[in-house]
């Protein structure tokens, strides 16, 4: 199943966010390489970082997202939502059933 991770910036932690950015970026790169993240990036105003994560359960998604250095160090506040993504990248992409089957096989 896909999960949407909303990572909210905390104004009082802005300096910490900047000084820990490389560790956060490396964690994201590692998750992309492992096939756990489909998309990641900030909102245009920088208030949120958002990523779409593949996990077998909500608990697993929360545990993985909690390892993001910005979350683990209390620099950002996270919310993890179950997301039923129907299609990605193209109109003739995998069906909903195929997407769910892919998520179950991970």
Q: Could you describe each region identified by the protein language model?
A:
Residues 1-106:
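Conserved, structured core segments of small domains
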């Amino acid at each position: 199943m896909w999960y949407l991770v909303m990572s909210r910036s905390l104004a009082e932690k802005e300096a910490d966010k900047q000084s820990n950015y490389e560790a956060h970026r490396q964690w994201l790169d590692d998750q992309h390489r492992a096939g756990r993240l489909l998309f990641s990036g900030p909102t245009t105003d920088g208030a949120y970082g958002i990523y779409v994560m593949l996990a077998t359960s909500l608990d697993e998604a929360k545990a993985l997202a909690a390892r993001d250095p910005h979350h683990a160090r209390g620099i950002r506040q996270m919310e993890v939502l179950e997301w039923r993504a129907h299609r990605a990248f193209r109109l003739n992409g995998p069906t909903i059933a195929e997407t769910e089957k892919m998520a179950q096989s991970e």
